[in-house]
């Protein structure tokens, strides 16, 4: 019987993709609309998500920075999506952030506590 090698895609790789999505969203917002706040927020939250993913790759139990970053972004962009009803960019980032929060929660709860 083969040994379970864990999840199909390690969580930190999903996290790096999420961080790239957030950062590129800020860059695109700046390029299309000249929005400096969008650029700053995208790079800040993308950088924090990237750092959180790196921490996760070093220690799978160290989820807090990534969880707080994606949870905060889910809340902020969720409110923007609720008020604007525009999927791009608020709905996309809110949805991706919520999925990351759920994935982190499932991952944290499914690991045996030591």
Swiss-Prot record:
Q: Name one GO biological process term.
A: regulation of heme biosynthetic process
User: Any keyword Membrane?
Assistant: yes
Task: Give the Gene3D superfamilies listed for this entry.
Answer: Transmembrane protein 14-like (1.10.10.1740)
What keyword terms does UniProt attach to this protein?
A: Heme biosynthesis, Membrane, Mitochondrion, Transmembrane, Transmembrane helix
Q: Where are the transmembrane segments?
A: 8-28, 33-53, 62-82, 87-107
Q: How does it sit in the membrane?
A: Multi-pass membrane protein
> Principal place where this protein is found?
mitochondrion
What Pfam families does the database record attribute to this sequence?
A: Tmemb_14
Q: Where in the cell is it found?
A: Mitochondrion membrane
Q: Cellular component terms, GO, for this chain's entry?
A: mitochondrial membrane
Instruction: Outline what the protein does.
Output: Required for normal heme biosynthesis.
The UniProt entry's sequence similarity note says: Belongs to the TMEM14 family.
The protein here is known as: Transmembrane protein 14C
Recall the taxonomic lineage recorded for the source organism. Answer: Eukaryota, Metazoa, Chordata, Craniata, Vertebrata
**Encoding gene, per UniProt annotation:** TMEM14C
């Amino acid at each position: 019987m083969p040994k379970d090698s864990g999840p199909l895609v390690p969580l930190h790789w999903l996290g790096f993709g999420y961080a790239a999505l957030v950062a590129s969203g800020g860059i695109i917002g700046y390029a299309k609309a000249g929005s400096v706040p969008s650029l700053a927020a995208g790079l800040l939250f993308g950088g924090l998500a990237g750092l959180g993913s790196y921490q996760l790759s070093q220690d799978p139990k160290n989820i807090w920075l990534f969880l707080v970053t994606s949870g905060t972004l889910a809340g902020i962009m969720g409110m923007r999506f609720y008020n604007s009803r525009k999927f791009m960019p608020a709905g996309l980032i809110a949805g991706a952030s919520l999925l990351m929060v759920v994935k982190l929660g499932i991952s944290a709860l499914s690991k045996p506590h030591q």
